[in-house]
Every structure is written in structure tokens, then in C-alpha cells.
Design a protein with these regions (language model features):
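A conserved beta-strand element that flanks and buttresses the S-adenosyl-L-methionine
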Residues: 73
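A short glycine-rich, Lys/Arg-flanked "PGG" loop and its adjoining helix->strand segment in the class I
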Residues: 85-98
Length: 168
């Protein structure tokens, strides 16, 4: 709220089947939304559900959009990167328009103890950072008005860590 212009563009990092891209597209003021994912299978699924949508198969952090956007959204993806904090700098410099924002949701972080065995049990790399390290990473990348909060907490689950930052 209050971080986007009345008309805005958006991209979802690690878009999977494109659910967030479709939801963004329906938001008042969204004039363009797209998604990128490293899984060709997931991009094909997104395209089959939403043939009119803009979905890109690309490996992050190397891939980047042709033009920057007002909103970069990422749910459950950034911790798969080797160095997500450096990627925040790339987002700030190359992906986000001045006045635009990033909104990130992560379930795998140090304080969420039930997520700490995911890397081993799924046999995939996951970068484990504390909530404070995630938040400080956004600040160090140059984002301002950085906020973080937890949502969906319940017994044995600390909730999703949500981070928001705005580019001046």
C-alpha cells in the first residue's frame, strides 16, 4: 500500500505455475505482469494456464528482464540462490524502477526452526539467513523504507517472513 504508482508493472521471480502473475494482473492499476522461473516445466504449465501471460524461462541470478518494473515479487525462491544478498543489489540496480519496490516472502530462515532441515531432506542448496540478515541485505542493497513482518505463524511454525523495500 502506498508504495506503487496508480499504474504499475510487476514481475514474479521464481513464478512456478504463474499464480502470482495472474493475481497481479487482476489488481487495479497493474498494466503489465510477468514471471520468470528456472524450470521449463513450470513455465510451460504457467503458459498452458495463462496463454496470454508473459512467462520467461531463465536461470537466476544471470537472467534479467528487458526493462525494469515498479514491483518485483518473490515468494519462496530467493533462498535457493547461492548469494541472495548480492542479488538484492542486482534487483536494486537493474530490475526496479525509481520509486518501485520489492516484496519478498521466505519460509526458510534461521528463526523458523521447522524449515532448517529442508535443504538436507530435499537435497537442494538453500541459503539460511536470519530475519535480521534478510532485512539488512535489502538495506545494504540500497532499498529504503525497509519493513519486515511474519505472517501465518502457528504451533511449530514461525510463519512466512515478508520483506518490503523501496528504491528511492
Amino acid at each position: 500500500k502506498g508504495r506503487l504508482p496508480s499504474e504499475f508493472t510487476a514481475i514474479d521471480l521464481g513464478c512456478g505455475n504463474g499464480w502470482a502473475v495472474r493475481r497481479l494482473k487482476r489488481m487495479p492499476g497493474c498494466i503489465f505482469s510477468s514471471g520468470v522461473d528456472g524450470s521449463e516445466m513450470m513455465i510451460n504449465k504457467a503458459r498452458s494456464i495463462d496463454p496470454e501471460g508473459e512467462y520467461f524461462h531463465g536461470m537466476l541470478p544471470e537472467w534479467s528482464p528487458d526493462t525494469p518494473v515498479n514491483l518485483v515479487l518473490s515468494m519462496e525462491f530467493l533462498y535457493y540462490l547461492e548469494d541472495p544478498i548480492s542479488f538484492f543489489k542486482t534487483l536494486h540496480m537493474e530490475w526496479v524502477l525509481p520509486g518501485g519496490s520489492v516484496a519478498v516472502g521466505v519460509d526458510h530462515y534461521l528463526e523458523n526452526e521447522s524449515s532448517l532441515d529442508w535443504s538436507e531432506s530435499l537435497d537442494v542448496h538453500m541459503t539460511t539467513l536470519s530475519a535480521e540478515e534478510w532485512e539488512e541485505g535489502l538495506r545494504m542493497a540500497g532499498f529504503q523504507k525497509v519493513e519486515s513482518f511474519f505472517t501465518g505463524a502457528k504451533e511449530g511454525w514461525n510463519g512466512t517472513l515478508v520483506l518490503i523495500g523501496t528504491k528511492a
